[in-house]
Amino acid sequence: MAAGTQAIDWGMAETLAYASLVESGHPVRISGEDSGRGTFAHRHAVLHDQNRERWDQGSYVPLRHLSDTQADFLVIDSILNEEAVLAYEYGYACSSPNELVIWEAQFGDFANGAQ
């Protein structure tokens, strides 16, 4: 995609959009049950070393390493408790009006009360 041999897909377009925001000084915060990989495994925002010795090591977030002057990019894999997480993220967004705060609903065949 970067070389121009393939069309830009949704995941790449989303990554470019987030990169442009954090490079412009606008923090981005995404939360949801599968936010790191994306609900359809399209995002790859958090990369994991499959050979790590501890569960709390071996994760890398490329969008946190664009430049020394960029804004923060935070991805949170939350618990499956939509109402509580959405309420928290709404409050967070209200107190941080200059930050892009996204709550990503989990996709599935179940009723999601927060939606």
PLM region spans:
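Flexible, glycine-rich loop/tail regions that form catalytic "lids" or insertion modules at the edges
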Residues: 1-115
